[in-house]
Curated annotation (Swiss-Prot):
Topological category with respect to the lipid bilayer: Multi-pass membrane protein
Cytoplasmic topological domain residue ranges: 1-25, 103-110, 160-183
Subcellular location(s) per record: Endoplasmic reticulum membrane
Name of protein: Efficient mitochondria targeting-associated protein 19
Keywords assigned by UniProt, alphabetized: Endoplasmic reticulum, Membrane, Transmembrane, Transmembrane helix
Predominant subcellular localization, coarse grouping: endoplasmic reticulum
Annotated EXPERA domain residues: 24-156
Transmembrane regions listed in the UniProt entry: 26-46, 82-102, 111-131, 139-159
Organism superkingdom: Eukaryota
Function in brief: Part of an import route for newly synthesized mitochondrial proteins termed the ER-SURF pathway (ER surface-mediated protein targeting), which retrieves mitochondrial precursor proteins from the ER surface and reroutes them to mitochondria for efficient mitochondrial import. Acts as a quality control factor in the ER, promoting the proteolytic degradation of nonproductive and extramitochondrial precursor proteins in the ER membrane thus removing them from the ER surface.
A GO-annotated cellular component: endoplasmic reticulum membrane
Organism: Schizosaccharomyces pombe (strain 972 / ATCC 24843)
Lineage, opening ranks: Eukaryota, Fungi, Dikarya, Ascomycota, Taphrinomycotina
UniProt-listed InterPro entries: EXPERA (IPR033118), Sigma-2_receptor-like (IPR051987), Sigma2_recept (IPR016964)
């Protein structure tokens, strides 16, 4: 039994992305970079945690909270603490990692799985926040949150599709077989 290198499979023609996928990856790159900024400067009270030593950065957060009175950020609740801790410990490092990978235009199924997991996670957590905003009739804030609901949902669908197509191509292509019998 001969084992074919996974590196050879991942670099084969089935993993070359069409132009539309490259455009989507560019959109995802800018989404992750902007979400990193939003997480650090608005969502997470990092400057308060650091004792106000970076007060110039907390101005954006103070402006947002005083202008829009976002109940997700203003009214404490245990479930919100859980969401914000996942944003700090899971999403922020992920944003940095995935942005670097997308900038290099990586065509790696591991990246696709990671973005799929993120997309499902971000969609479900934002969905919960949208329900609270809907109950409070905070329409303007809902419009701010909507891209963080729609884009992760699209990412999950897109990455799931990429993975399914690559699995079908790997299964049907003769050079893409993981194992093959040698004569």
């Amino acid at each position: 039994m001969k084992v074919v290198s996974l590196r050879r499979i991942y670099s084969s023609e089935i993993y070359k992305l069409p132009t539309t996928r490259l455009h989507m990856d560019t959109l995802y790159y800018y989404y992750f970079v902007s979400h990193l900024a939003a997480a650090l400067f608005v969502d997470l009270p990092i400057t308060e945690w650091l004792g106000g030593s970076l007060s110039c950065l907390s101005g954006l957060r103070r402006f947002y909270l005083s202008t829009y009175e976002d109940p997700i950020l203003l009214i404490p609740a245990p479930w919100k603490t859980a969401l914000f801790s996942s944003e700090l410990f899971f999403q922020v490092p992920f944003f940095i990692w995935v942005s670097l990978r997308l900038r290099k235009k990586a065509r790696d199924p591991v990246l696709w799985v990671a973005i799929l997991i993120y997309g499902v996670h971000a969609f479900t957590t934002t969905w919960c926040c949208m329900f609270e905003l809907f109950a409070e009739k905070k329409w303007m804030i809902m419009s701010f949150y909507f891209p963080y609901l729609a884009i992760p949902l699209w990412m999950a669908i897109d990455m799931g599709g990429r993975l399914v197509k690559s699995c079908h191509a790997a299964k049907s292509g003769p050079s893409s077989t993981i194992t093959s019998k040698s004569d």
